[in-house]
Every structure is written in structure tokens, then in C-alpha cells.
Amino acid sequence: MKIGILCAIPKEIHFFELLPNSGQRVGGRTFFKSKHSFHELIIVECGIGKVNSAMVSTILIQEFKCEMLIFSGIAGGIDPDMEIGEVLIGEFLIQYDYGALKDGNIRVYRAGEIPMGIQKNKAEFVLDSVIKEKINTSLPDVRMGTILTGDVFLQCQETRKELYEKFGAQAVEMEGGAIAQIAEQFGIPAIVVRCLSDLAGANGHKLSSTSLKKAAKSSFETVQSILNALL
């Protein structure tokens, strides 16, 4: 299978093996070829945010003919029951900053729908059921849950609490929901793997270089296990 692997920042892509002289520049990004058993991989640092990740996802599908997308990276935890270093796979992905703003509150719609009137569909993009079963079988200890995506780096305890109360989500980040949206539009599956590097502003905790590196490595290792499960 040909799989596109996305990371947002250098520390996230650092652990992946990139074949020498395999880089190809498209749209201001360098796409590297690699292999994992029978899988052909296209690995790329997409950049931060929904626009970057959506653009690169489209290139992976259209230009490189990828049949699946996997994101590997870090996230901020918003579930009080989760701790730094825990890995989460996105079963549900919601773009929490997409919708209609009224009286200071945002009514979240499914990204891409006209944010007016009755919501036609649920806001979340859902992990493919067959892939979910394979991951659960091979990685029974890895948690699945809801990941929120927005174009904001969250370091605010009050907002963290509000997002958890509103969505019951486990983590917040800046790319996953957009990748899931693009993958769905092209009819291919997407898997978003995140390891908690910080707690999104809880108790004054700040993101450190050490926790970022450890989280990026844990996410990478989980992706390797997922690739094995997909053989």
C-alpha cells in the first residue's frame, strides 16, 4: 500500500527514515520516499495548521497517489484523566473552530458544510471501522478518542476546561481534522496519531523541548506498529 505520512514540525519527522536523495519538491514542501515492509511511504513535514496540512494531504493524494494518510505528532491533553506521554489515536476528529459565532459562542458545524440552519451531519470525522478493528487487535493498550483541531496553539487552562466540557475530547492540536476532511473527500482513510507533550495550559504547565521530543518519538513508534498491523 502507498501511504502518506505527515508531520507538522521537524521534531516530529526526525525519527522517520528518509531515503537519501529521494526528496521531491512540490508546493514548497519536500516529499521523501521510504519503505516499511510491503508499504511504500511518502513522508513530509507539512507545516503547522489546517491550511498547510490540507494542502499537503491533497498533494499526497493527487500527485503521489497515496491510498491512505497517517499523521504522526504531538498534542495538548485536555482530558483530566490523561497524562503527558500517553498516546491517542483519533477515532473522532472535530474542527472546533469551524461554525457559526453568535453572542460570543461558536456553534460547531461539520467542516465544509454551510454553517447556517440545521446541522445536516455530526461535526466529527470518524476513523474507518476496518482500520479501527485492526489497530484495536494489534495495539489493544493504545487509547482511541476524540481529537479537536483548530488554528490555535492552546495554552489556556480556562479554554482547555471549556473544550473538554463541550466535546468530552481527549486532545487538541492544529492539523488532524483537516487531514481527515481531505481524506474523506477523496475517499481514502486517514489515521491521526498523537502523543501528549503538554496539557494545553493546565496548572501552568508549559511545553518543554524534552517532553516534545519524547512525545514525538512515542507517536513515531506507534505509527510503526500501525504500519505492521496494516500488512
Question: Could you tell me what each predicted segment is?
Answer:
Residues 200-231:
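His/Asp/Glu-rich mid-to-C-terminal helical/loop segments that flank catalytic regions of hydrolases
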Residues 1-64:
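N-terminal short beta-loop-beta anion/metal-coordinating cradle
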Residues 130-141, 182, 221-229:
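Generic non-transmembrane alpha-helical segments
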Residues 41-46, 146-148, 193:
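Active-site-proximal beta-strand elements of phosphoester/diester hydrolases
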Residues 66-70:
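Proline-aspartate-enriched helix->loop->beta-strand connector
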Residues 78-166:
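Mid-sequence, gly/pro-rich, charge-dense loop/helix-turn segments that line enzyme active sites
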Residues 153-205:
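A C-terminal functional module that forms or caps the active site or interfaces directly
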